[in-house]
């Protein structure tokens, strides 16, 4: 399953992990669809929020590559794809400089987003604080002296940042208002995003356990982690039903087309006999989540 990395360019592309970006954009698109539903959509907010999220996700990916190498999770025994630093083509100092670069880009893009979106200094300060928290979370998931990912807290972070803050924050920056129904969709996205992380951790359960990374699958075991994965998939789609029946926006049920793809992902994870068979499910769940959001948005705006 491990693809050999032969050049430095390949190593950097591998470190960026482009396949994670669709999931990162899903919450931004969801918040923007909801803003359009409320007739308050702004293109500049969508573009800047998407750019900021991409920078943050790349920062997180680089930090993950760096941190797991330092802490020993990316050893030769790891069954997932080869990481960039692990390949030997990128040094730890080089990776650290790249982390600084994308940290600065995330901050700059986020500040520009806030300058465009809000005029009230209290709101500006609030969202600046949330943005700095997002940068901190991206870096310290596996990096630093006490990475929270090694304590099994990654699921909470993903649920909050990819779900609640991603959707609600984007909606607010478009509309400068709060709509209770957006919380329901934020919960759905939080569930789906957490499922992606859970599949990642199921894949890496053996190497994580040896490295002392106490992810949820390591703590509860593979079988219960698979059950947990089903709960996340089902819960996310349950909240869609709650949104649809409450708002009477019946066309949003179009998103259930993606639900059937998620079911296939769940079955794939359950049937996988090893990490090599689990790995493709990761990308499929991320893409299914983005498709879910797009279908939801189409149904919402019809």
Language model features with spans:
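Functional transmembrane core segments of multi-pass inner-membrane proteins
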Residues: 158-205, 223-226
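Small-residue-rich segments of transmembrane alpha-helices in multi-pass membrane proteins
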Residues: 24-30, 156-171, 217-222, 283-296
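Membrane-embedded alpha-helical segments that form the functional core of polytopic membrane enzymes
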Residues: 30, 39-63, 126-139, 179-199
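Topogenic membrane-insertion module of multi-pass membrane proteins
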Residues: 1-44, 48, 145-146, 158
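Intramembrane alpha-helical segments
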Residues: 5, 81-180
